[in-house]
A protein has these predicted regions:
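Alpha/beta-hydrolase-fold enzymes
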Residues: 1-32, 181-187, 196-268
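Conserved alpha/beta-hydrolase "nucleophile elbow" surrounding the catalytic nucleophile
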Residues: 106-108, 189-198
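Amphipathic alpha-helical interaction motifs in eukaryotic regulatory proteins
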Residues: 106, 126-131, 169, 177-181, ...
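Alpha/beta-hydrolase active-site loop
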Residues: 158-183
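Short, hinge-like loop/turn segments at secondary-structure boundaries
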Residues: 154-157, 236-237
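Catalytic domains of lipid- and phosphate-ester/thioester hydrolases
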Residues: 77-78, 167-171, 179, 188, ...
């Protein structure tokens, strides 16, 4: 202790001042000031009480568009779009942005809000991408907060809710992508999926070969592919066979699935 004190006393004043300022910055980064803590709590409360996607965007000063598209089987899905960087002049709704297009899709039991409900815009991928010059779209599965309508069924009927992840892959993903490309006039887009949003894309790209021409990059964040506890020994054995040919039957309300001439080998 005495040695440290002597060394500190003997150090030149500029050196001690420099060390003092550095330690203050380190301390401030680890222990926020009361003003910053109050500001952070205020932002957290605003996020917690936000009613919808629009409220979450307005917290950070971003403009957005809301679109509704119709799937081939009659469901109305909500799409959200961010095409104007923060502080830039807003373009007319639905107008071509002439920018590279990115499509983000949420995970299980979520909606598009999951991408923008963070405590800093620097941590929200859609905000980062739109500021970098991308035309950002966020999708929603049928049945969630933004997709509870259909031209065929009443949302309160059993028929409306009679769907599964197969319908997400067969209709929701490809139809959403087609709507976006038709509106933006873009040739293709980049797909970012989170959890089940990745699984839906894997399935959609498999059963719709033409969809692969519309997706230039597929990014799977925390992809959900094989949930634990749902193992089926017979199916597992078939999938691990050396050569397996699959012919999936036609759905009554859709065009036939593609019959794949071969499936890559799966190793145990």
């Amino acid at each position: 202790m005495l040695v440290r004190l002597v060394i500190t006393i003997l150090l030149p004043r500029p050196v001690t001042n420099w060390l003092y300022n550095k330690t203050r910055k380190v301390y401030a980064s680890w222990y926020p000031t009361p003003d910053k803590q109050h500001h952070d709590r205020k932002q957290i409360n605003r996020i917690r009480t936000a009613a919808d996607f629009g409220d979450l965007c307005s917290i950070w000063g971003y403009e957005f568009e809301e679109h509704v598209m119709l799937t081939k089987d009659g469901y109305l899905l909500g799409l959200h779009r961010l095409c104007t960087p923060k502080g830039a002049q807003r373009t007319s709704i639905g107008m071509q942005a002439n920018k590279p297009v990115v499509y983000l899709h949420h995970g299980l039991l979520m909606n598009s809000e999951v991408w923008v409900c963070l405590t800093s815009p620097d941590r929200a991928l859609p905000f980062v991408l739109v500021d970098l010059g991308f035309d950002v779209w966020l999708g929603n599965n049928r049945g969630n907060k933004y997709s509870k309508k259909s031209i065929k069924y009443d949302p309160n009927s059993k028929e409306f809710w009679n769907y599964s992840i197969d319908d997400f892959a067969w209709h929701d993903i490809p139809d959403s992508i087609s709507y976006i490309l038709d509106l933006t006039k873009a040739k293709d887009l980049s797909y970012v999926g989170f959890s089940q949003g990745s699984a839906q894309a894997f399935a959609a790209l498999s059963i719709h070969p033409q969809l692969n021409q519309k997706v230039n990059v597929f990014v799977a964040l925390a992809p959900a592919m094989s949930p634990e506890g749902l193992a089926a020994p017979i199916v597992d054995g078939l999938m691990k066979a050396s050569y397996v040919k699959f012919s999936i039957p036609r759905r009554p309300d859709s065009s036939p699935y593609q019959t794949h001439p071969h499936v890559p080998r799966f190793r145990p």
